[in-house]
A protein has these predicted regions:
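Aromatic-residue-lined binding/catalytic grooves and analogous aromatic/hydrophobic interfacial grooves
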Residues: 2-232
Length: 232
């Protein structure tokens, strides 16, 4: 994502890397000291939020009271680095000041078939942090590109191809014709599936990709794993 505020150009990149098993976000600015941010969490479920050095940690147990006892415990770690800026950790947030580049590494684990999920979460983040952003990205591209490039789709471009994505959406809602946007969404869906469901994933992606807890996504079904007409 590219955008400009005033005379500063910002670039944001995000990818889920299977080889390193983390989410990686990078934000850069064309001007020094242009990135100032406070990273905190607003959780939908009860959880404890703390900091450990440059890491923001959240952990708890997911319960579904209406469905009886059960649920998995989880821990997530968000590691933050800003080489040309400063970090300030508080009880439940980390501030980034006067940076021109910000990198965030995220891993989340549950105790589903893994009692050592907390130590694995920490080890995974620490290991990824030791690699440069360029190395993480290159490894990711080498892994997923051969899979992604198996399919291509050409439907034409249309007159709105040069607009930002949100502006293209606006034109389509007004009745505009933009087949290139259909291609973009098709390939985006493929990328999400490749990022969330691989041969070494603990569980495959569900029908809509995520479990519905009636908080993050309020639908009339739970989107869980069960046998019904979909198996046909």
């Amino acid at each position: 994502t590219n955008y400009t505020i005033g005379d500063v150009n910002y670039v944001r990149e995000c990818f889920a890397t299977n080889p390193d098993d983390v989410l990686v976000l990078r934000m850069s600015a064309s001007k020094k000291k242009a990135i100032n941010a406070k990273l905190s969490l607003s959780m939908l479920r009860e959880s404890e939020i703390s900091t450990d050095g440059n890491q923001l940690i959240f952990e708890g147990t997911v319960n579904f009271p209406k469905q009886g006892p059960g649920g998995v415990s989880f821990q997530g770690r968000i590691a933050i680095s800003a080489p040309n800026g400063t970090l300030q950790a508080e009880d439940s947030s980390i501030s980034v000041n006067d940076a021109d580049m910000l990198t965030i590494v995220i891993d989340v684990r549950t105790n589903y078939k893994n009692d050592a999920y907390k130590s694995l979460c920490k080890e995974t983040v620490v290991k990824a942090e030791k690699k440069t952003y360029e190395k993480l990205k290159k490894t990711h591209l080498n892994d997923y590109t051969p899979l992604f490039d198996r399919v291509s789709l050409q439907l034409g471009t249309g007159e709105y191809a040069g607009l930002p994505t949100d502006k293209r959406w606006e034109q389509v809602k007004k009745g505009g014709y933009d087949p290139g946007l259909d291609v973009l969404l098709f390939q985006y869906g493929r990328y999400l599936l490749l990022a969330s469901s691989r041969e070494n994933s603990p569980l495959p992606a569900a029908l809509q990709g995520f479990f519905n807890d009636n908080l993050a996504c309020n639908m009339g079904w739970t989107n869980d794993y069960h046998l019904d007409i979909n198996t046909q």
